[in-house]
């Protein structure tokens, strides 16, 4: 037996909301080493292992301690080290990381006397794996990677191929956490190659399953689907089952013991299909998994996932029959589960789904105090009763983490029915438990919930102050667990949009009153919270907390103090715009302007604005554009004029990221914003902004692109002319076009590039999903992560910085309201000081004309934002072509990052 045969679930500190980023595959639960150990010690250890696998961690802990004492009395140091390792794993499950670290260290200390025996090396590899798991939990990723590399070498030494594969999967997750995507990808490819070389077997099926799940966790859902499908087909063949792995085909499901593994794979396929937003396929996989499995936990997990997905996708005024059928049958099934952490969380999961139905108006509000009178399954009364039983089970298991979740979930049910006293008491009890075990991933939820309750329970000032304090602590905890939040466990009911983003927005809403003036301190706090939300969005986009942020003042970036930073925030009932102005006293540098408008109305108008940019007549666009101008710019006009600023830097929120701010229209002056005196740039936040301006030196450009049609994308005949003209303005250190425009060539050219401007004229797609954000090369779609890795080769070559990255023919994904997040993603991951990109694909001739004019402006030492503005005004003038006056031609170009 080895690490690999114990699936990831056994290593998870399970929660109904979060899968910790980089959660490694656990050290395997092995039997004691051979020798003359006393039967009592061996039986104790086996009993402890059984309890551990049943998720009864506190009883397992007691038995492991007895087993350790028995082995210690016999002087069995190797078995002592083994049991210490299990104690560490058990303490990790209980969330007691200090004790877990203590026993892990003691286990390794007992293994200091080196040996070449198989037993010694096997236990050493397990101990190294456990130590790496702890180090990752503490954020010591490089140390974790080192230990997993040592574990891999140890498994290799004893010829344990499954163990080697498991520890290499852990390495890949650590590399991903460190942002070393190419190395992570290479490692995962090595794992796949190693598995492919093995004969078909249960071991290979399990290996592919684990690899597929890992790929989903790190965000490669396409590859995850392929690997899981391979695992499924192999196991279907082994168990003589046909058509079960294809959701498009009809399958006859007849459960047999041999098909249990197949059910497990189908469950994972459902999770990956859900991550791909293939709702119907995910439901089909979940249904097959539930029908095929004879294990209660697998059946329930599949049905709960199916119910949650159906609830999310339901838009009917009444509960659909498919949902109602599950809601009516699941409570009885929950009652049959033996007490364990999984059964507690299954109860919580079900209750949270009922709460979602209630919040969407599909369940009537009811008094949930008298739980003995519950009759209907689809009621909050039933939900409360089920969770209360779960809490009792968690108490009996001495599982503090589960107790906290159960109490907090009960609090959320009482919150919904506005039974405020009970809601507050339960939430505070849940928070106390979470803080007691330093479980910040749970604590932030109850701090947020407490903030909502205090905010809703009347007007007393002490409640408002208490709500602000609760939200403040919730945001601080969110920032401290960034790495844990970015990998979503699709087995659980967790969503960034539902359970992270609202914390920031509600906190901003509380800090910025609808009427009256906020204090200077609250205004500054709100600005910082907005910056934190931008960072959290990018973390969620990359599924990695790999971005470094540093507090920065605008005057540190713009020494001439000619820049205003504008933060429009979309709140539920208003647009709050914070403006940071230069040349002001410290307590007066921030100003707030509020426009009362429902969120839905505002966002509908913004989406309409984007659609009208493609209308033949500019007048249709202008009618909507001037409305958005009145909401965003009109209220701050006087402040901008009085401060004498020349640069406007926008930190855009939500749907605003997809529209061209420069094309907002002033109906009074009858001019676009860009026609005023302002240079315009956008940034995902000052804290992510490299402050250095464009280097004052002889500029060089590295240019490349595609002019021919490739991969269903049309030809770009204007690219050749565009690149040729750039050469007449700049010294170019390289030029790669069409067949030469490959990732390998780009990387090779970049390594010797002395720095300056990197100009890539090619198709590309920006999306709110990292896997769908790419630029097109001759032979592949270069994903944003791989593109980042290619650009990192320039940083590693000790050449000058890339001052400006230009992507002149890209576009945002149609129908994706947050697609512009992909632009910000490329901008911050590229390492370039600034990025010039397009919101939509533009006419070839117009693009070439604007880019050539932009380079002419840069050559005259104009700042980047100023150069872009002048180039856009050149097209807008109609001098080259009257058609180009339409904002469709000049407005999509946006400068992200440093504007100087």
Segments predicted by a language model, with ranges:
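Non-membrane alpha-helical segments in proteins
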Residues: 42-53, 78-93, 126-133, 137, ...
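Mid-chain, structured segments of secreted extracytoplasmic proteins
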Residues: 72-109
């Amino acid at each position: 037996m080895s690490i690999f045969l114990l699936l990831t679930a056994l290593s998870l500190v399970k929660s109904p909301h979060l899968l910790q980023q980089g959660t490694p595959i656990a050290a395997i639960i092995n039997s004691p080493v051979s020798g003359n150990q006393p039967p009592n010690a061996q039986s104790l250890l086996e009993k402890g292992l059984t309890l551990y696998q049943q998720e009864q961690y506190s009883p397992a802990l007691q038995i492991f301690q007895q087993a350790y004492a028995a082995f210690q009395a016999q002087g069995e140091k190797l078995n002592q080290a083994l049991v210490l390792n299990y104690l560490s794993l058990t303490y990790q499950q209980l969330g007691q990381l200090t004790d877990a670290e203590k026993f892990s260290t003691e286990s390794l200390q007992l293994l200091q006397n080196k040996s070449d025996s198989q037993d010694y090396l096997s236990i050493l590899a397990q101990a190294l794996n456990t130590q790496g798991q702890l180090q990752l939990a503490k954020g010591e990723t490089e140390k974790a990677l080192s230990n997993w590399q040592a574990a891999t070498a140890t498994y290799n030494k004893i010829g344990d191929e499954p163990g080697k594969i498991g520890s290499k999967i852990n390495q890949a997750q650590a590399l991903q956490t460190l942002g070393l995507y190419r190395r992570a990808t290479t490692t995962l490819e090595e794992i796949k190659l190693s598995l492919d070389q093995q004969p078909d077997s249960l071991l290979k099926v399990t290996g592919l399953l684990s690899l597929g799940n890992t790929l989903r966790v790190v965000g490669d859902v396409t590859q995850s689907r392929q690997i899981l499908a391979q695992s499924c087909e192999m196991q279907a063949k082994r168990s003589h089952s046909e058509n079960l792995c294809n959701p498009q085909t009809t399958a006859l499901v007849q459960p047999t013991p041999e098909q249990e593994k197949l059910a497990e794979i189908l469950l994972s396929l459902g999770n990956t299909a859900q991550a791909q937003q293939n709702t119907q396929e995910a439901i089909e996989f979940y249904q097959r998994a539930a029908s095929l499995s004879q294990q209660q936990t697998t059946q329930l997990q599949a049905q709960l996932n199916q119910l949650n997905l159906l609830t999310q996708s339901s838009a009917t005024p009444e509960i659909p029959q498919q949902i109602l059928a599950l809601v009516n049958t699941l409570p009885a099934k929950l009652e049959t589960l033996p007490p364990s952490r999984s059964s507690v969380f299954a109860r919580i999961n079900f209750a949270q789904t009922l709460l979602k139905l209630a919040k969407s108006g599909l369940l009537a509000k009811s008094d949930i105090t008298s739980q003995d009178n519950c009759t209907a399954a689809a009621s909050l009364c039933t939900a409360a009763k089920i969770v209360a039983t779960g809490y009792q089970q968690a108490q009996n298991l001495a599982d503090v983490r589960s107790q906290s979740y159960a109490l907090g979930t009960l609090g959320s049910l009482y919150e919904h029915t506005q039974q405020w006293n009970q809601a507050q008491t339960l939430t505070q009890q849940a928070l106390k438990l979470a803080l007691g075990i330093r479980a910040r991933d749970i604590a932030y939820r109850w701090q947020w919930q407490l903030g909502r309750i205090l905010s809703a329970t009347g007007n007393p000032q002490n409640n408002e102050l208490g709500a602000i304090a609760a939200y403040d602590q919730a945001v601080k905890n969110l920032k401290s667990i960034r790495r844990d939040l970015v990998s979503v466990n699709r087995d659980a009911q967790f969503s960034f949009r539902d359970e992270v983003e609202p914390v920031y927005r509600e906190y901003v809403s509380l800090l910025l009153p609808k009427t009256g003036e906020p204090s200077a301190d609250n205004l500054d706090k709100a600005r910082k919270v907005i910056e934190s939300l931008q960072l959290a969005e990018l973390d969620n986009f990359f599924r990695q907390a790999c971005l470094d942020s540093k507090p920065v003042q605008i005057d540190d970036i713009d020494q001439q103090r000619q820049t205003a930073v504008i933060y429009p925030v979309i709140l539920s009932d208003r647009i709050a715009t914070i403006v940071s102005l230069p040349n002001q006293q410290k307590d007066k540098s921030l100003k707030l302007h509020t426009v009362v408008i429902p969120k839905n109305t505002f966002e509908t108008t913004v989406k309409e604005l984007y659609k009208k940019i493609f209308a033949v007549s500019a007048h249709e666009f202008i009618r909507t554009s001037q409305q958005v101008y009145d909401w965003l710019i009109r209220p701050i006009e006087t402040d901008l004029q009085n401060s004498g600023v020349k640069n406007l830097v926008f930190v855009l929120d939500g749907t605003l990221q997809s529209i061209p701010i420069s094309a907002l229209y002033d109906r009074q002056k009858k001019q676009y914003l860009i026609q005023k005196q302002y240079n315009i740039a956008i940034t995902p936040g000052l804290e992510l902004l490299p402050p250095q301006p464009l280097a004052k030196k002889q500029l060089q450009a590295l240019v490349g692109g595609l002019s021919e049609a490739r991969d269903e994308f049309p030809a770009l005949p204007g690219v050749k002319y565009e690149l040729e003209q750039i050469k007449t303005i700049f010294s170019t250190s390289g030029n790669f076009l069409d067949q030469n425009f490959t990732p390998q060539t780009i990387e090779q050219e970049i390594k010797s590039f002395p720095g300056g401007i990197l100009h890539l004229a090619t198709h590309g797609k920006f999306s709110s999903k990292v896997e769908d954000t790419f630029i097109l090369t001759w032979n592949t779609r270069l994903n944003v992560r791989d593109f980042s890795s290619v650009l990192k080769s320039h940083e590693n070559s000790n050449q000058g910085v890339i001052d400006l990255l230009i992507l002149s023919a890209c576009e945002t994904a149609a129908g994706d309201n947050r697609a512009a997040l992909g632009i910000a993603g490329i901008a911050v991951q590229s390492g370039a000081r600034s990025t010039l990109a397009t919101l939509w694909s533009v006419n070839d001739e117009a693009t070439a004309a604007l880019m050539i004019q932009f380079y002419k402006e840069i050559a005259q030492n104009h700042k980047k934002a100023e150069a872009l503005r002048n180039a856009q005004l050149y097209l807008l003038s109609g001098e080259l072509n009257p058609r180009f006056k339409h904002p469709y031609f000049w407005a999509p170009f946006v400068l992200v990052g440093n504007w100087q």
